[in-house]
A protein has these predicted regions:
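Sec/Tat signal peptide C-region and signal peptidase I cleavage site
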Residues: 18-22
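Short N-terminal segments immediately surrounding and downstream of signal-peptide cleavage
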Residues: 23-41
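Bacterial N-terminal signal peptides
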Residues: 6-16
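Short loop-to-helix capping motifs
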Residues: 32-38, 223, 250-254
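Periplasmic alpha-helical coiled-coil/stalk elements that build and connect Gram-negative outer-membrane
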Residues: 3, 139-249, 261, 350-353, ...
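Small/polar-residue-enriched beta-strand and adjacent coil segments characteristic
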Residues: 24, 63-135, 254-339, 350, ...
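Acidic, low-complexity, intrinsically disordered peripheral segments
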Residues: 74, 407-479
């Protein structure tokens, strides 16, 4: 399980203790895990893919057919009849009921390996879709973290903008007072007015950005943000760029999905070859026929037949299908290589970005301290005439820019850490210890795999299994 480490997120307010009723990042992730429609849709898609296995296993099972007919026939037969008075015609009625009933059982003894290949292919497709579900889960979580952090980031940027506007408003008043006594010129006043107007525009922009961030939060999480507790970056299970790359190559869900896609493509080749093989089936039938020949006619019996079929030539389509399957297998093999390289590249990039963000935070804190000293000195020097109003405004702007940069970098530190976790395949509900009932990807599969009949959802009343999740056995060959 990935643990959390503490960090001061922001300037003053961001690092302050959160209210007891504040929403946490875990709250947001739990809501997304339970309600996000993209994740819910992918779970339904996995359950649909699960059905491929019982459909393939049906090839081992008997096929039972019952048929019958019922009816009524009308007719007559006229026959010559010899009597004392000579030959006469005698007509007899043939009106009667008729019907047939039969039951037939067919069992495939050998299908050229078709059922075995179909089952293997369906199973590998299930494993592939489970990996894709993990990938979607990580995407939803990454979006949730970004939405959560962006709201807090924009709240703090708005606070900085409001504070800056307030400072410049007070500075404009002081500038106007000094102008009224002739210490400075009208140009100094105009410069202060311009800076205040720009600051007020920045407040409006920050307010708009915050509203956009809140809307994104509600879209991803499912409810509007309240008082948000400052999030913390993840303590990652990797300590270097190399270890991050190795973990991504082994655990990234896109890589695991590509591995099972390749396995399914190999199964498809076997399936295509099976179409050239003979098939052997055993068929048993019991029947009864009443009245099909004449009134009172009854015929009943039973039979057992073995049928052997060997397709010698079907126009060449089967050979084309084999060649096609072989090329699809090669495509899947190359796609696995692409997925692995992409996962490694992303892990390395996110790791370097995270390291750069950490270093930038340290330098930005030092920059803020220096800018605060510089602003204080510039203001003092301006009072004695050795610095201009423009110098003071520039110093104030430099301090604001460094404060904004720190807020942005602290926000990036959180999101970057989660990006690394996702790149190495370790950003799931189980990995971060999220306190929610975990979705059991095996529940539906286990319920339908050996189901011979039934059309309802066998897990419709299942909420979740804390002991199971889509990522439990991915990549270990256990399912």
């Amino acid at each position: 399980m990935i643990s959390r480490i503490g960090i001061l997120v922001g300037l003053g307010l961001l690092g302050a203790a959160s209210p007891a009723a504040a929403q946490t990042l875990d709250d947001a992730l739990a809501a997304a895990y339970a309600n996000n429609p993209q994740l819910q849709a992918e779970r339904a898609n996995l359950r649909s893919t699960d059905e491929g296995v019982p459909q393939a296993l049906a090839g081992w099972r008997p096929q039972v057919t019952v048929s019958g007919t019922a009816g009524y026939t009308q007719g007559s037969i006229t026959e010559p009849s010899a009597g004392l008075l000579g030959s006469t015609q005698v007509t007899s009625s043939q009106d009667h009921q008729l019907g047939t009933v039969s039951a037939q059982v067919t069992e495939n003894i050998y299908s050229g390996g078709q059922t075995k290949a179909q089952t293997a292919e369906a199973t590998d497709k299930v494993k592939s879709e489970r990996a894709n579900l993990v990938n979607i889960e990580q995407q939803v979580f990454t979006n949730a973290v970004s939405a959560y952090v962006t709201v807090i980031e924009n709240q703090q940027l708005l606070a900085l903008a409001i504070n800056n506007a307030q400072v410049l408003k007070e500075q404009l008043k002081a500038t106007q007072d000094r102008f009224s006594v002739g210490e400075i010129t009208r140009t100094d006043v105009a410069q202060s007015e311009s800076s205040l107007a720009q600051a007020e525009a920045q407040v409006q922009t920050a307010q708009g950005n915050l509203q956009t961030a809140r809307a994104t939060f509600e879209d991803v999480i499912g409810f509007p943000p309240g008082r948000l507790s400052p999030p913390q970056p993840l303590a990652l299970p990797v300590s270097s760029r190399r270890s991050a790359a190795a973990a991504a190559a082994a655990n990234n869900p896109a890589v695991i999905q590509a591995q099972f896609n390749q396995a399914a493509a190999a199964d498809a080749v076997d399936l295509a070859f099976s179409k050239l093989m003979p098939t052997l089936a055993l068929q048993g039938e019991v029947y009864q026929d009443v009245g099909s020949v004449e009134a009172g006619y009854i015929s009943k019996g039973a039979e057992v037949l073995a049928s052997l079929s060997w397709p010698l030539y079907q126009g060449g389509a089967e050979y084309s299908a084999i060649r096609q399957a072989v090329q699809q297998r090669e495509y899947a093999r190359q796609q696995l290589d692409v997925a692995r390289r992409t996962a490694i590249e992303n892990a390395e990039q996110y790791w370097e970005t995270l390291a750069a963000t950490r270093a930038t935070i340290t330098s930005t804190r030092a920059e803020i301290a220096a800018n605060e000293i510089a602003l204080d000195g510039t203001e003092r020097e301006a009072l004695v005439g050795s610095r201009t109003t423009l110098d003071v405004l520039n110093a104030q702007q430099l301090l604001l820019q460094s404060q904004v940069t720190l807020v942005q970098n602290l926000a990036n530190l959180v999101t970057d850490s989660y990006q690394v976790a996702a790149a190495i395949g370790r950003f799931t509900a189980r990995d971060i210890g999220l306190h929610v009932p975990l979705y059991d990807d095996n529940a539906y599969y286990g319920a339908v795999k050996n189901a011979w009949v039934g059309t309802g959802d066998p897990t419709a009343n299942s909420v979740g299994d804390p002991n199971g999740s889509p990522e439990d056995n991915l990549g270990n060959g256990n399912h």
